[in-house]
């Protein structure tokens, strides 16, 4: 739902802010904060890239990524807890609280990012063409081969990986 996406983005933004603040304190500690700096790095590893992938999966206009990042970063402490504000920054058109319960479909960017040996440019081409994860999962090898930069090897790799991911989800192995 829109609420789920907004909540994930809210948490990712809070993690980004807390990490930034802790990093400032660690810089003041100098060499005495080295161990703590390593622990913080371990805790937040991958959080920034996950944040960007979730944004790319759900923002209304993928070309607005820089604007969305800037607006989320500039939200004040009182507005970061407002899921409606976060949803609207993402371009998800939330006008009342009930709109937060609307179903929303990802583009498939995160799913494609899990396909080994798939370049970012290929991910952009495929996700822009298919617009949603269900459309992407329904694509055949032939459909994918028609896209620029996606040959038979990549097309087969994508379809096999997406099928494997779908099986893992339906089997309850992963929760997304």
Segments predicted by a language model, with ranges:
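Long, highly charged, low-complexity intrinsically disordered interaction regions
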Residues: 2-146, 152-176
């Amino acid at each position: 739902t829109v609420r789920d996406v907004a909540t994930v983005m809210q948490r990712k933004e809070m993690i980004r802010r807390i990490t930034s603040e802790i990093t400032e304190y660690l810089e003041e500690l100098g060499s005495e904060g080295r161990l703590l700096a390593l622990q913080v790095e371990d805790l937040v590893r991958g959080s920034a890239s996950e944040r960007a992938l979730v944004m790319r999966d759900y923002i209304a206009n993928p070309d607005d990524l820089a604007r969305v990042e800037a607006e989320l970063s500039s939200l004040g402490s009182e507005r970061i807890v407002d899921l409606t504000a976060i949803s609207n920054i993402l371009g998800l058109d939330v006008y009342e609280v009930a709109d937060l319960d609307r179903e929303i479909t990802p583009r498939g960017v995160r799913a494609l990012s899990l396909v080994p040996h798939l370049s970012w440019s290929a991910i952009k081409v495929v996700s822009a063409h298919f617009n949603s994860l269900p459309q992407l999962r329904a694509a055949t090898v032939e459909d994918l081969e028609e896209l620029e930069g996606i040959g038979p090897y990549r097309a087969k790799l994508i379809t096999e990986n997406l099928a494997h991911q779908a099986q893992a989800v339906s089997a309850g192995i992963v929760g997304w």
